[in-house]
């Protein structure tokens, strides 16, 4: 085995790209059906009312409405509160 590194070899110089995870729509924001609410690894946030969960644990809106974050039984839930339409 060589006891000295060869010319210009290095064990450094590698890094993975950032995955752009996190909350994408915050509490009180209006969203449409299908909009991504949270990108995550694992279920840091759990789906609540009108929220679906993708195969990579991404949470998305199933219906249009306002985003709401609540804590229930030590779980952080994301709900979509549908907008009530007022008949005039």
Curated annotation (Swiss-Prot):
One of its GO terms (biological process) is translation. Residues 1-25 are annotated as: Disordered. It comes from the Bacteria. Keywords: Ribonucleoprotein, Ribosomal protein. This is Large ribosomal subunit protein bL27. GO terms for molecular function: structural constituent of ribosome. It holds the Pfam family Ribosomal_L27. NCBIfam families: L27. The keyword Ribosomal protein applies. InterPro entries: Ribosomal_bL27 (IPR001684), Ribosomal_bL27_CS (IPR018261). GO terms for cellular component: cytosolic large ribosomal subunit. Belongs to the bacterial ribosomal protein bL27 family.
